[in-house]
């Protein structure tokens, strides 16, 4: 059973380096496969410290999501505040989301694990941490999209594409996987997102 409690309170007791290490573990293995002992070993502390002082695996997980989700919203804020209801406004907002995910691949990866039924001990992760930026983006881009385009589905298409690209890159016709750190592939992917936005925009 997952440990419950406010992630903010737990996070206040957890050192930043522990949250950083735990984020990497959760992104690589998923919540269900990470144990208290794995966190302790990776952080160089005793398992009793993780279970006691840090509140256990569940609270560490919530604290990781709290921090990354807050950072994501803070990062999106300038583009959201300066949003213009046109194609270029959408491009700037999408770029901002993509840039955050490229710089912080742990969060997209954690959510992809979640989409495959990870961390089911926590039924409310989406409204608490997952959907707020997506709702924001959908509401903003809805002002710019053509009337025939569904804002929610369009936004989710962007999110799915960005998370999948950040996690796995693309596999070309030659069968070679090219990751998101390949600058050439990254440029192609960004251009493709821009094309989607411009074609879906009303103006």
Residue ranges and their predicted role:
Residues 67, 110-114, 157, 161:
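Short acidic/histidine-centered micro-motifs embedded in hydrophobic/aromatic stretches
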Residues 13-17, 21, 25-59, 63:
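Helix-turn-helix
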Residues 63, 77-107, 145-158:
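Hydrophobic alpha-helical connector segments
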Residues 73-77, 119-145, 152-153, 187, ...:
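Amphipathic alpha-helical packing segments from all-alpha helical-bundle domains
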Residues 1-13, 24, 203:
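N-terminal intrinsically disordered/low-complexity leader segments
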Residues 2-3, 134-143, 147-148, 161-203:
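C-terminal peripheral helix-coil segments that are non-catalytic and often amphipathic
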Residues 102-124, 168-176:
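Amphipathic alpha-helical segments used for helix-helix packing
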Residues 48, 62-92, 130, 134-140:
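Amphipathic alpha-helical linker/stalk segments
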């Amino acid at each position: 059973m997952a440990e419950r409690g406010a992630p903010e309170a737990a996070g206040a007791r957890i050192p930043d380096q522990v949250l950083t290490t735990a984020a990497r573990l959760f992104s690589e293995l998923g919540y269900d496969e990470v144990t208290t002992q794995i966190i302790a070993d990776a952080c160089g502390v005793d398992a009793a410290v993780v279970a006691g002082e840090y509140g256990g695996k569940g609270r560490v997980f919530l604290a990781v999501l709290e921090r990354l989700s807050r950072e994501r919203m803070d990062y999106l804020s300038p583009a959201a505040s300066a949003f213009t209801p046109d194609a270029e406004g959408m491009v700037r907002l999408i770029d901002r989301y993509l840039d955050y995910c490229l710089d912080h691949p742990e969060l997209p990866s954690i959510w992809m694990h979640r989409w495959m039924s990870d961390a089911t001990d926590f039924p409310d992760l989406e409204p608490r941490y997952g959907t707020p930026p997506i709702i924001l983006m959908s509401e903003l881009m809805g002002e710019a999209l053509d009337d025939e385009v569904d804002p929610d589905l369009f936004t989710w298409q962007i999110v799915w594409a960005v998370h999948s690209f950040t996690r796995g890159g693309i596999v070309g016709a030659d069968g070679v996987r090219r990751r998101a750190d390949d600058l050439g592939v990254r440029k192609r992917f960004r251009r493709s997102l821009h094309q989607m936005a411009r074609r879906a925009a009303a103006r």
